[in-house]
Amino acid sequence: MKKRLLLITILSFLWFAGICLAGEAPHQISVFVLNRDIADFKDYVIMETAIPVRYMENIEEVEIKSIKGLKTGYIAYATCAAPGHIVRIKLKYKDSSKKFFKNLLKQIKKKYGEPDEYRGDPFHILIAWKWSFVDKEGNRISLNLQHNTQDPDQKMGNAIKLTMRNLVEEDQQCYRLKADDPREKLRQRDWKVMDSGLSEGDFFMPR
């Protein structure tokens, strides 16, 4: 029994070590860095495009400006637990070829090891790989790389996504706790705009 427990412990350690030590956990793609303030990248994003992420209203997402080598991109950041901190980087490369994808996949494998999960379809119309990491601070980070040239329901071409999972979850939890506060629920209601009935001069000036 003791030997079995020891074996399970060793295997669990090796599995965890494999996640952590296959390569240093990535935090950056292009100029964008996870857990940094979105304000640090104001020259690379269009803040006026900020909208809540679908099904995650607490997370906001902005479009990137034109950056060499990239076609499009969206940077998501927290608004509750760590306001402004980047939680996800989604970029689409300008080069949509499979050759580019294979070369990038090869480089990622060389640096971070084999992917942990295949997320594409069995026919390889959509090819998608996922890596999972835990960095030195205990942050859980996922990296997704995909190639798609036929599935219209997915982003066409070559796309990459880097997400700090725990930061997303912490922000969602923060948002839920605030929403549970009766006062916060009242603030979030779509209240009718009231008219004071005062003239502009009387309204703005102290009397």
What is each residue range found by the language model?
Residues M1-L7:
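Bacterial N-terminal signal peptides that target proteins for export
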Residues I8-A17:
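Bacterial N-terminal signal peptides
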Residues T9, L21, V87-I89:
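General secondary-structure edge motif
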Residues F13, G69, C80-A82, G120-P122, ...:
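Sterically constrained small-residue positions within well-ordered secondary structures
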Residues G23-E61, L91-R207:
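Non-cytosolic coordination micro-motifs
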Residues E63-Q107:
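Mid-chain, structured segments of secreted extracytoplasmic proteins
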